Amino acid sequence: MKTKWFGGLRYACYVATLFFVLIHAGCNKKEVIPATPELPVLEQFMIEKQNNPGLEADIAFAIKGDSVIATEPYRYRKMLVPSFVTNAQGIFVGVVKQESGATAVDFSTVQTYTVISKDGLRKTYFVKIDWIADSLPHLYIQTEGNTPITSKDDYVNATLRIDGMGKYADFTGTTRIKGRGNSTWGYPKKPYRLKLNTAASLLGLAAEKDWVLLANYLDPTLMLNAVAMKIGTQLELPYTNHVVPVNITLNDQYIGCYNFTEQIEVDDNRVKVGGDGFLFELDSYYDEPYKFRSAGYSLPVMIKAPELSAAEELLPIQTAFNNMEALLADPAFPVNNYREKIDVESVAKFMLVYFLTDNEELNHPKSTYMHKTATGKYTMGPIWDFDWAFGFEKDQKHFLTYNSAPFWTGKTPLPAGTKFFTRFLKDPQFVALLKQLWTDYKTGHFDALIRFVETYGLSIRTAKAADYAIWKKGAANNQTEVETLQQWLTSRRGYIDDYLNSL
């Protein structure tokens, strides 16, 4: 019995000891928490000059959410090698694994990058470059025998070659070229007119023979005419010109950055009023063969189309114009049928372009166009010539003032254009229309205009510097002038608010 009891005691002690050890071990054991897999992210993305021969500078990207975006001047070669920093084990475009600083990718379109962690977690990024056309189309003009262009009347034979720089179709053909413009022809940087031997579509514009090269010598930004045309397009003014910035080499000499645009003329692809329609220019230069002074306001009316051959052909055109004008001068105005003769919405939109740009040429008037079909209303447009606008003063500086009144109502006697255009402001319905169109423009288009100025400025920055090297107008780096123009437009917007509220 003793032996059995002693064995039982020994067994009990063994069990107790084991229990104590297990309890002690359990109390000291730490809880094991499974590790959370690390999400793969793209930390940095860039295109480095050192890995891309021909690149002028590194291209930096902004990473926001799943978007990776950069803004960069347009380049013909868009197959570029990016560099990146990521915590992922692998990064892929499609099924192709990417190596930082080594794998070339076509950035002419959005590329989808997938980063994958060692645990198989994935994240997708959409990488794109917003390309801005900094490499402008280049026009190479070679006159016959290198003949200089010295006349606004006599054309010189020439060849024209256009390098579209990958953005536009290239072109080679024959043309004639002469000078153009009124006061602008007297400046060192000359404007020109081209007449192709055969109609052609140039720089994406509808096929025609006649084209214009605007020099913009007075313009420190080289974009004021383009900005005005943008406003006209936003307001849907009929037949507003397109503007394409270009570089020009004439007879093997680079002559600067120009605006390439359409010649204002009657044609199906220009001012489409038909063969029996009319195009008028109101201009105090008064230098066309067929012209007249209107009876009511002494407007200098010149006939641009149709092409007349005898003085008697002018009489019915003059009579019809005077009849329209008489309705404006009528003491019963505006309670008469004047709206049946003139498109008042076109007048209102036309005024707003000139108000916002502070183009006071309406007062003379100068370079002021009207058109009509044979049976239609007199309609304002196309808009033209904004060299002397945007706060321009006679010392040839822009942006000095933003609060100049649109009309010269304080002059004695009143200029012809002032009398004609301010007459519309005596019509309450017209003023209400003008105010509504302005409100609509401010809310729907003004911000886009400011962005257009920024984008256009970027697109010409290299050409602007090259132009400055020749003509020393404005500044070599036009970013300051771009910002000045944006600020001026914003201030001018506030002034137009006050002006219209005073009507």
Which role fits each region the language model picked out?
Residues Y217-P238:
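A conserved alpha-helical element in kinase catalytic cores
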Residues G90-V93, L235-N247:
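Short, well-structured beta-strand/strand-turn elements
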Residues C27-P137, I141:
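Beta-rich interaction/scaffold domains
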Residues G173, S183, Y187-P188, A305-H364, ...:
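Middle-to-C-terminal accessory/interaction subdomains
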Residues R193-K195, A199-S201, A215-Y217, L237-N241, ...:
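Internal "kinase-insert"/substrate-recognition segments embedded within catalytic cores
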Residues M1-T36:
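Bacterial Sec-dependent N-terminal signal peptides
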Residues V156-A215:
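Conserved oxyanion/phosphate-binding beta-strand-loop segments in alpha/beta enzyme cores
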Residues N28-T36, E43-Q44, E48, I116-K118, ...:
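Regulatory N- and C-terminal appendages and interdomain linkers associated
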